[in-house]
């Protein structure tokens, strides 16, 4: 359960929503009252939703999952970076690049380019065999990539979940996560649609103290999950598999079927002789795949 009190939330100003003329009707269920033209959020409901989201993050990390922290608005950048770094999780605190998730393969190539540039000594003109201007351009390229991709340099695959500050600001990130079936935990203010994410946290998404409080809270959930993962690993390595999203399972099954087809084709004569056997084996494979699916747990261009 999340270790947070109503007093902490009130002091951080999480109860203050937007002006009444700037609201999303779907947030009505989380609004307590209106005061001086500003909506007041019902923090009792927020607490309940925090507990649910906290347990989800903890469980996800405990099963070897990763959580991507996202917050590019000025009030959230430092909190996102510090919290994610503390628990060794990936983060995006600068501009979200289109395709960061949906075109992850290309993004990975840019990350590799960043790592390559980091090995260079930009002060060694003679040893590099490059001119000062060429080295300067390469250094600028490295600095730009560091700002854009430094937070995900160690993310080798798409995340298992995302924590987002302000879903209106990070609409593209949320959209990409949904396309890949990645659950989203997000701070949702009174001007946003709580149904746009799986785990909404109704709260003020503009107050720096409030953002820090909630971001650190979910970083604590990650930390608890890491501790639980460590305990599970010492008992059994079989519990360390990362839960796969539905799209990952589908891709894996397609690759497995493609491999089976390649191995099955030897020569035309052999195929004709063993046609019935292969047919039976293919039916069995499909039956096994269906059984596994039934048992399995459901889950701008890049510059």
Swiss-Prot record:
One of its GO terms (molecular function) is structural constituent of ribosome. GO terms for biological process: translation. Residues 258-303 are annotated as: Disordered. InterPro entries: Ribosomal_uS2 (IPR001865), Ribosomal_uS2_bac/mit/plastid (IPR005706), Ribosomal_uS2_CS (IPR018130), Ribosomal_uS2_flav_dom_sf (IPR023591). It comes from Bifidobacterium animalis subsp. lactis (strain AD011). CDD domains: RPS2 (cd01425). Residues 294-303 have a biased composition (Basic and acidic residues). This is Small ribosomal subunit protein uS2. Transmembrane segments: none annotated. Keywords: Ribonucleoprotein, Ribosomal protein. Coiled coil: none annotated. GO terms for cellular component: cytosolic small ribosomal subunit. Belongs to the universal ribosomal protein uS2 family.
């Amino acid at each position: 359960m999340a270790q947070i009190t109503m007093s902490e939330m009130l002091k951080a100003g999480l109860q203050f929503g937007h002006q009444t003329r700037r609201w999303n009707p779907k947030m009505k269920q989380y609004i307590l009252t209106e005061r001086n033209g500003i909506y007041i959020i019902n923090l009792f409901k927020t607490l309940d939703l925090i507990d649910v989201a906290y347990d989800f993050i903890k469980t996800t990390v405990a099963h070897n999952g990763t959580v991507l922290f996202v917050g590019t608005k000025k009030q959230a950048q430092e909190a996102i970076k510090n919290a994610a770094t503390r628990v060794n999780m990936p983060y995006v605190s600068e501009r979200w690049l289109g395709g960061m998730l949906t075109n992850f393969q290309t993004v990975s190539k840019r990350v590799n380019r960043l790592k390559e540039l980091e090995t260079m000594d930009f002060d060694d003109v003679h040893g590099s065999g490059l001119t000062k201007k060429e080295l300067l351009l390469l250094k600028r390229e490295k600095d730009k990539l560091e700002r854009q991709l430094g937070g995900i340099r160690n993310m080798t695959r798409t995340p298992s979940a995302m924590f987002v500050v302000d879903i209106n600001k990070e609409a593209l990130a949320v959209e990409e996560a949904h396309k890949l079936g990645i659950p989203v935990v997000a701070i949702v203010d009174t001007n946003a649609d709580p149904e746009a994410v799986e785990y909404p946290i109704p709260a003020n998404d503009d107050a720096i103290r409030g953002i820090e409080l909630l971001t650190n809270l979910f970083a604590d959930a990650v930390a608890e999950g890491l501790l639980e993962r460590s305990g599970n690993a010492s008992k059994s390595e079989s519990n360390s598999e990362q839960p796969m999203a539905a799209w990952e399972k589908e891709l894996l099954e397609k690759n497995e079927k493609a491999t089976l087809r390649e191995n099955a084709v030897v020569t035309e004569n052999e195929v004709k002789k063993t046609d019935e056997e292969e047919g039976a084996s293919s039916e069995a494979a499909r039956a096994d795949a269906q059984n596994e699916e039934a048992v399995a747990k459901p889950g701008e261009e890049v510059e």
